[in-house]
Amino acid sequence: MYEFIKPNYKDNNIVNLMSSISNSFWKKHEYNTLKSLGSEELDSFENIVLIVVDWLGYNYLKRQENSFLLKNLDSKLTSTFLSTTPCANTVFQTGYPPQQHGLTGWTANIKEVGGITRILPFTSISGEETLSNTGFNINKIMDIDSLHNGFNWKCFTIIEEKKSKRDFIKYVAKETKIIAAKTYKDIFIELKELIKSKSKERRFIHAYMDEFDSIQHFNGVNCDKTNLLFKDIDREIQALAESAKGTNTKLIVVSDHGMIDHTKESQLWLKDIPGLEECLTIPITGEPRVVDCFVRPRKVKDFKKIMETTMSKYCWYFPWEQLINDNFYGLGEVNKKLFDRVGDYVLIMKDNYVLRDTLEAYVWEVIPQKAAHWACSDDEMLVPLVIIDCN
């Protein structure tokens, strides 16, 4: 029915991985455990270490011959819809996909704060000041528990220092000890020390690094800078595995999404598409490759005509209820906030096209991006599952 990859929330998604981890720490999870790594395979380990390398796509890793990570590759998983950090990385912190956590992209129409919001830094679309400084509480937009609430053992979050201070991280990691690190190399130093330290309890340690994502956005997927950074991260993980020998630790390396290259020619601007802006009640939200469109009722016919003519080369478009009913955002009970945040129509971009609005992306006119994610190609949607036992 669809010409792209849908998330497999039944048994082969990052959500199912978190179900396996949750069940191993005696917390019931509403989704099935992962087909390739059940909770019983985790139960005997003293330390479960989850290393999330933002952007490390499955297809990219398969091209890295002789790498330590490729040698320890177990299988491939699907990301969430959208294949983006706010939607997918939040899974590693809450255990659940957008259907439950309610986040729909880097920007979203957040009724609780009365406007378009950048979720992770918790700022308005037009400013850098955190909304908490103006009286808004992130608890009002996040009504899901952290994954760690109810775990019977110690939990740790290791993350880059600036991000550790965000309201979002303080909310989703509030049941953990947050350890701030200056760089990804410092994250590995903290991991080595923590794993080697003695503990009377089992531990779940979640480390997140995003340098790989940042460098590719501005340099491209297969450029020298990207490949050099991968090789260094690969060496660091190999050294960590060597250091952890004899500690009864299971290292799990995964990602939130992959990435594809795009060019200046594949970048579309809302202002350049005749009639489209006039159809919308508010600016586009979501991500540049999965776009939420809130359409004026009297302009629905015009909007559909534009989609089926001018835009048909560049994207598919779907009514919101189709994507929710077809389980793009997850399974089970739907977070009511999702209905406010998903557009009346959702555009999923074809090939390597992106659609931008100058309101949310003015910076990219000055510093163009060379790679993107967010949508449903196999490069974006498939992520690796790497498993290393350190007995």
Show where each model-derived region lies.
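Feature captures the catalytic ectodomains and active-site-proximal regions of enzymes
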Residues: M1-N391
